[in-house]
């Protein structure tokens, strides 16, 4: 990403670039602040009845934990703002650890949406136009969701989509390994002790579309 793009993003968020014009790159900023960053984005899903549904997802940069914020056929600024309130309620005391929220320039992210996060001392950073890589963590999740799940299923309607996404997000957070987390899932607990006698157990999800493997004594 060009230095001028990084400068625009940081300046728009009220973060003054270093006077010597050699401050951190966008990637360095994301790495340094990962545990304090949320990213939000929309995915769309077309049903077998040719109806388009919109999915609002939020990703915690540090742990790669995903939150399914909401599903609707008619996204509006008011709806998106309510999902922001719901997310902060879901996070509870954990919301205090976040300082930044990255979003694109979608018109659904209206000033009231930003105000919800501002009220929680979370600064909204708006990415430049036509720069999807600026919100790469959220984009990567949406890409994985399509490749691993949605591209293989025919979605009937909102209730069906909600059930599918809930199961996939449970798998993603609880079992899917991530390279940035040393091949552990976002919600991983304490790893098994070295030398313990264990055997793998396979669990099928989404009708066998996805396989999970757990260790049992």
Q: Would you name each region that the model predicts?
A:
Residues 1-217:
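Charged DNA-binding/catalytic regions of mobile-element recombinases
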